[in-house]
Amino acid sequence: MGSRALLLLKATTAETLLFTSKSTFSKALIRNSTRSFSTRSALLPPDLPRLAETARISLTPHEVEEFAPKIRQVIDWFGQLQAVDLQSIEPSIRADTEGDNLRDDSPETFENREAIIAAIPSYEEPYLKVPKVLNKD
């Protein structure tokens, strides 16, 4: 049995079942999900074991049970933010404002180019090759 199956066996509450992507409860919740702005958010919590794997941390089944309600609470806070009516408020910062403050994307030459090349593990003209950071397939 994999770790997901083990979590399903240990899951005793509906809250815990939300965090297992294989559960029929979470699939039914996804299918029947509607947007409502109550104190409970309509946003679904993430698959906690997968989130931990992506963050490169290991969680015990006890920690999954401990963090599940805390993550649910954070998601509920986001639901409360979504319920705020912002139609009458003028935005102060917008993505489409004029006046780009970005510099021109132009190549630069460095005075000590050879020192940079000597400091990296692999060099293939004109690229500096570095080791893989994420080993996802």
From Swiss-Prot:
Name the EC number(s).
6.3.5.-
InterPro entries noted in UniProt: Asp/Glu-ADT_sf_sub_c (IPR036113), GatC (IPR003837)
Annotated Pfam families: GatC
Where in or outside the cell it occurs: the entry states: Mitochondrion; Plastid, Chloroplast
Q: Which PANTHER family match?
A: GLUTAMYL-TRNA(GLN) AMIDOTRANSFERASE SUBUNIT C, MITOCHONDRIAL (PTHR15004:SF0)
Fetch the HAMAP family from UniProt: GatC
Q: What NCBIfam families does UniProt report for this protein, alphabetically? A: gatC
What more is known?
This protein may be expected to contain an N-terminal transit peptide but none has been predicted.
- Cite the record's note on assembly: Subunit of the heterotrimeric GatCAB amidotransferase (AdT) complex, composed of A, B and C subunits.
**Protein's UniProt name:** Glutamyl-tRNA(Gln) amidotransferase subunit C, chloroplastic/mitochondrial
Q: Which lineage do the record's taxonomy fields give for this organism?
A: Eukaryota, Viridiplantae, Streptophyta, Embryophyta, Tracheophyta
Q: Which gene encodes it?
A: GATC
